[in-house]
Amino acid sequence: MAQLTCENLTLGYEGREIISDLSFSVNSGDYLCIVGENGSGKSTLMKTILGLHSPMKGKITTGDGLKQTEIGYLPQQTLVQKDFPASVREIVISGFQGKCGLRPFYTKEEKRQALENMKKMRIDDLQKRCYRELSGGQQQRVLLARALCATKSMLLLDEPVAGLDPRVTAEMYSMISQLHKEGITVIMISHDIEAALRYATHILHIGREVFFGSKETFKRGMFLGSYSAVTGGERNG
Protein backbone atom coordinates (compact mmCIF):
# COMPACT_ATOMS: atom_id res chain seq x y z
CA MET A 1 0.00 0.00 0.00
CA ALA A 2 1.27 3.47 -0.88
CA GLN A 3 2.36 5.79 1.94
CA LEU A 4 1.01 8.77 0.04
CA THR A 5 -1.45 8.98 -2.85
CA CYS A 6 -2.46 12.13 -4.72
CA GLU A 7 -5.46 11.69 -6.98
CA ASN A 8 -6.57 14.15 -9.67
CA LEU A 9 -5.22 17.16 -7.78
CA THR A 10 -5.96 20.66 -8.99
CA LEU A 11 -4.12 23.34 -7.01
CA GLY A 12 -4.09 27.10 -7.18
CA TYR A 13 -4.73 30.44 -5.52
CA GLU A 14 -7.77 32.73 -5.61
CA GLY A 15 -9.44 30.60 -8.25
CA ARG A 16 -6.38 30.50 -10.55
CA GLU A 17 -5.18 26.98 -11.33
CA ILE A 18 -1.44 26.31 -11.32
CA ILE A 19 -1.57 22.49 -11.26
CA SER A 20 -4.37 20.53 -12.94
CA ASP A 21 -5.45 16.89 -12.59
CA LEU A 22 -2.17 15.61 -11.11
CA SER A 23 -1.97 12.02 -9.85
CA PHE A 24 0.95 10.12 -8.34
CA SER A 25 1.80 7.83 -5.43
CA VAL A 26 4.78 7.38 -3.12
CA ASN A 27 5.67 4.05 -1.54
CA SER A 28 7.66 3.42 1.61
CA GLY A 29 11.36 3.76 0.87
CA ASP A 30 10.95 5.91 -2.25
CA TYR A 31 13.11 8.97 -2.89
CA LEU A 32 10.99 11.28 -5.02
CA CYS A 33 12.43 14.47 -6.50
CA ILE A 34 9.94 17.11 -7.64
CA VAL A 35 11.34 19.25 -10.44
CA GLY A 36 9.93 21.84 -12.82
CA GLU A 37 9.96 25.45 -13.90
CA ASN A 38 9.77 28.35 -11.44
CA GLY A 39 6.16 29.05 -10.55
CA SER A 40 4.97 25.60 -11.62
CA GLY A 41 3.52 24.89 -8.16
CA LYS A 42 6.15 22.67 -6.54
CA SER A 43 6.06 24.37 -3.12
CA THR A 44 2.27 24.66 -3.29
CA LEU A 45 2.05 20.91 -3.89
CA MET A 46 4.28 20.21 -0.89
CA LYS A 47 2.25 22.49 1.38
CA THR A 48 -0.94 20.80 0.19
CA ILE A 49 0.50 17.38 1.08
CA LEU A 50 1.18 18.77 4.57
CA GLY A 51 -2.37 20.08 4.90
CA LEU A 52 -1.27 23.73 4.88
CA HIS A 53 -3.27 24.35 1.68
CA SER A 54 -6.49 22.75 0.47
CA PRO A 55 -6.73 21.38 -3.07
CA MET A 56 -9.24 22.97 -5.42
CA LYS A 57 -10.10 19.47 -6.62
CA GLY A 58 -8.91 15.93 -5.94
CA LYS A 59 -7.70 14.29 -2.76
CA ILE A 60 -4.59 13.24 -0.86
CA THR A 61 -4.57 10.08 1.25
CA THR A 62 -1.94 8.49 3.46
CA GLY A 63 -1.48 4.78 4.09
CA ASP A 64 0.95 2.16 5.33
CA GLY A 65 0.58 3.50 8.88
CA LEU A 66 1.58 7.08 7.98
CA LYS A 67 -0.36 9.99 9.45
CA GLN A 68 -0.25 13.48 7.95
CA THR A 69 0.91 14.84 11.33
CA GLU A 70 3.89 12.47 11.28
CA ILE A 71 5.59 13.93 8.21
CA GLY A 72 8.83 15.85 8.77
CA TYR A 73 9.11 19.12 6.85
CA LEU A 74 12.07 21.30 5.95
CA PRO A 75 10.68 24.50 4.37
CA GLN A 76 12.41 27.18 2.37
CA GLN A 77 13.75 29.76 4.80
CA THR A 78 12.79 33.42 4.82
CA LEU A 79 15.20 36.13 5.98
CA VAL A 80 13.19 36.47 9.19
CA GLN A 81 13.50 32.75 9.92
CA LYS A 82 17.25 32.81 9.31
CA ASP A 83 17.51 35.49 12.01
CA PHE A 84 15.44 33.58 14.58
CA PRO A 85 16.83 34.20 18.13
CA ALA A 86 16.58 30.70 19.60
CA SER A 87 19.16 28.07 20.49
CA VAL A 88 19.88 25.14 18.20
CA ARG A 89 18.51 22.75 20.82
CA GLU A 90 15.27 24.72 21.16
CA ILE A 91 14.67 24.65 17.43
CA VAL A 92 15.48 20.96 17.01
CA ILE A 93 13.29 19.76 19.87
CA SER A 94 10.41 21.92 18.64
CA GLY A 95 9.98 19.27 15.96
CA PHE A 96 8.07 17.28 18.59
CA GLN A 97 5.42 19.98 19.09
CA GLY A 98 2.95 18.18 16.84
CA LYS A 99 3.12 15.16 19.17
CA CYS A 100 2.83 17.04 22.46
CA GLY A 101 -0.92 17.55 22.42
CA LEU A 102 -1.92 19.55 25.49
CA ARG A 103 1.15 18.75 27.59
CA PRO A 104 3.41 21.82 28.02
CA PHE A 105 6.71 19.93 28.17
CA TYR A 106 8.89 17.48 26.27
CA THR A 107 9.38 13.94 27.56
CA LYS A 108 12.73 12.44 28.51
CA GLU A 109 12.52 10.23 25.41
CA GLU A 110 11.87 13.21 23.15
CA LYS A 111 14.88 15.02 24.62
CA ARG A 112 16.98 11.91 24.01
CA GLN A 113 15.80 11.62 20.41
CA ALA A 114 16.46 15.31 19.79
CA LEU A 115 20.05 14.83 20.94
CA GLU A 116 20.40 11.74 18.73
CA ASN A 117 19.15 13.68 15.73
CA MET A 118 21.60 16.50 16.46
CA LYS A 119 24.41 13.93 16.60
CA LYS A 120 23.20 12.40 13.34
CA MET A 121 23.38 15.83 11.69
CA ARG A 122 26.74 16.52 13.40
CA ILE A 123 25.46 19.63 15.22
CA ASP A 124 25.38 18.35 18.82
CA ASP A 125 28.39 20.57 19.59
CA LEU A 126 26.30 23.57 18.47
CA GLN A 127 23.20 22.87 20.57
CA LYS A 128 23.69 25.87 22.87
CA ARG A 129 24.56 28.26 20.04
CA CYS A 130 22.07 30.84 18.80
CA TYR A 131 20.55 29.72 15.51
CA ARG A 132 21.00 33.08 13.78
CA GLU A 133 24.76 32.97 14.41
CA LEU A 134 25.18 29.82 12.31
CA SER A 135 26.22 29.48 8.67
CA GLY A 136 23.62 28.61 6.04
CA GLY A 137 24.73 24.99 5.92
CA GLN A 138 24.61 24.64 9.70
CA GLN A 139 21.13 26.16 9.78
CA GLN A 140 19.89 23.65 7.21
CA ARG A 141 21.25 20.76 9.29
CA VAL A 142 19.44 22.18 12.33
CA LEU A 143 16.18 22.26 10.37
CA LEU A 144 16.76 18.73 9.08
CA ALA A 145 17.32 17.50 12.65
CA ARG A 146 14.09 19.28 13.61
CA ALA A 147 12.21 17.55 10.78
CA LEU A 148 13.56 14.19 11.96
CA CYS A 149 12.02 14.81 15.38
CA ALA A 150 8.62 14.92 13.69
CA THR A 151 8.94 11.64 11.82
CA LYS A 152 10.51 8.23 11.45
CA SER A 153 8.79 7.63 8.12
CA MET A 154 8.71 10.52 5.64
CA LEU A 155 10.60 13.77 5.03
CA LEU A 156 9.41 16.62 2.80
CA LEU A 157 12.31 18.89 1.83
CA ASP A 158 11.74 22.15 -0.05
CA GLU A 159 15.01 23.00 -1.83
CA PRO A 160 17.23 22.01 1.12
CA VAL A 161 20.46 23.10 -0.59
CA ALA A 162 19.30 26.49 -1.92
CA GLY A 163 22.03 29.10 -1.46
CA LEU A 164 24.66 26.66 -0.20
CA ASP A 165 28.15 26.42 -1.66
CA PRO A 166 29.16 23.25 -3.57
CA ARG A 167 30.98 21.59 -0.66
CA VAL A 168 28.13 22.14 1.80
CA THR A 169 25.61 21.12 -0.86
CA ALA A 170 27.42 17.80 -1.33
CA GLU A 171 27.44 17.23 2.44
CA MET A 172 23.71 17.94 2.67
CA TYR A 173 22.87 15.57 -0.17
CA SER A 174 25.02 12.90 1.48
CA MET A 175 23.15 13.27 4.79
CA ILE A 176 19.77 13.06 3.06
CA SER A 177 20.91 10.00 1.10
CA GLN A 178 22.00 8.30 4.33
CA LEU A 179 18.58 8.96 5.91
CA HIS A 180 16.97 7.39 2.84
CA LYS A 181 19.23 4.34 3.16
CA GLU A 182 18.07 4.04 6.77
CA GLY A 183 14.49 3.62 5.55
CA ILE A 184 13.01 7.12 5.51
CA THR A 185 10.91 8.06 2.50
CA VAL A 186 12.16 11.33 0.98
CA ILE A 187 10.18 13.81 -1.12
CA MET A 188 12.42 16.69 -2.20
CA ILE A 189 11.90 19.76 -4.36
CA SER A 190 15.02 20.50 -6.38
CA HIS A 191 16.23 22.70 -9.23
CA ASP A 192 19.31 20.46 -9.55
CA ILE A 193 18.29 17.83 -12.08
CA GLU A 194 21.77 16.26 -11.99
CA ALA A 195 21.47 15.61 -8.25
CA ALA A 196 17.88 14.45 -8.67
CA LEU A 197 18.98 11.80 -11.15
CA ARG A 198 21.87 10.78 -8.91
CA TYR A 199 19.93 10.25 -5.69
CA ALA A 200 16.22 9.82 -6.48
CA THR A 201 14.35 6.61 -7.22
CA HIS A 202 11.46 8.51 -8.84
CA ILE A 203 10.95 11.87 -10.54
CA LEU A 204 7.87 14.09 -10.63
CA HIS A 205 8.18 16.85 -13.23
CA ILE A 206 5.42 19.46 -13.17
CA GLY A 207 4.89 22.44 -15.43
CA ARG A 208 4.17 22.61 -19.15
CA GLU A 209 5.11 18.94 -19.37
CA VAL A 210 4.15 16.48 -16.63
CA PHE A 211 5.98 13.25 -15.83
CA PHE A 212 5.88 10.80 -12.97
CA GLY A 213 7.88 7.59 -12.89
CA SER A 214 11.26 6.04 -12.22
CA LYS A 215 14.40 8.06 -12.82
CA GLU A 216 15.43 5.50 -15.46
CA THR A 217 12.23 6.18 -17.42
CA PHE A 218 12.78 9.91 -16.97
CA LYS A 219 16.31 9.63 -18.35
CA ARG A 220 15.04 7.82 -21.43
CA GLY A 221 12.48 10.60 -21.91
CA MET A 222 15.21 13.23 -21.59
CA PHE A 223 17.33 11.52 -24.24
CA LEU A 224 14.30 11.49 -26.53
CA GLY A 225 13.82 15.19 -25.85
CA SER A 226 10.36 14.77 -24.38
CA TYR A 227 8.60 13.82 -21.17
CA SER A 228 5.86 11.19 -20.85
CA ALA A 229 2.60 12.38 -19.34
CA VAL A 230 1.36 10.83 -16.14
CA THR A 231 -2.10 9.31 -16.40
CA GLY A 232 -4.24 8.03 -13.58
CA GLY A 233 -1.39 7.92 -11.07
CA GLU A 234 0.33 5.03 -12.85
CA ARG A 235 3.82 4.32 -11.55
CA ASN A 236 6.27 3.96 -14.42
CA GLY A 237 8.79 1.62 -12.89
Predicted regions and their residues:
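Helix-to-loop junction immediately C-terminal to a conserved catalytic motif
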Residues: 50
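H-loop/switch region of ABC-family ATPase nucleotide-binding domains
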Residues: 190-191
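Catalytic Walker B motif of ABC-type/P-loop ATPase nucleotide-binding domains
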Residues: 155-158
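Conserved ABC transporter NBD signature motif
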Residues: 58-69
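Conserved ABC ATPase "signature" region
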Residues: 108-126
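Conserved ABC ATPase signature
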Residues: 130-134, 138
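H-loop (His-switch) and adjacent beta-strand-loop-beta switch element
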Residues: 203-216
